[in-house]
């Protein structure tokens, strides 16, 4: 019984795959695993805190927008009502009130612009998703056997660079976000 070249090639490929897996497994050590796992766990916590911060800024933006809409509606209604008032003093009082409400509306809009709440909400939400994606990928890789993971040097380099990139791109967190994280996960 002779073995064809194709069969020899297939057997060689299977043996090479086994050798590659063995070499890959030997490239891993506990220090690499611990460092990568720790970065993944930190990324998970940062995802939680940035998602919470995104919700805070989105809520603030929505409140300021609603207050502005309500105040503008009141000022507009007062201006319309003032047109139908015959008494000059009453008309002036209504117009001054409408002007005051208009000033209040301008103040609310200035606050919204100053805090830039919409942009902060979007940036915190985006970085939260990126930290979540990082955590999922690290969890998947570290959940595999040493033979089936990406090579240790490749995964370590990627994990370090991506974690540092995310840290650099992330907006600062509020103290309330950090406190909520500590309170929520105090038993861990």
Predicted regions and their residues:
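Conserved non-transmembrane functional hotspots
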Residues: 2-70, 81, 94, 108-188
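Juxtamembrane "helix exit" motif at the C-terminal ends of alpha-helical transmembrane segments
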Residues: 71-90
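Single-pass alpha-helical transmembrane signal-anchor segments
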Residues: 73-76, 100-111
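Short alpha-helix boundary/capping motifs
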Residues: 78, 85, 102, 159-160
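Hydrophobic alpha-helical transmembrane segments
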Residues: 88-101
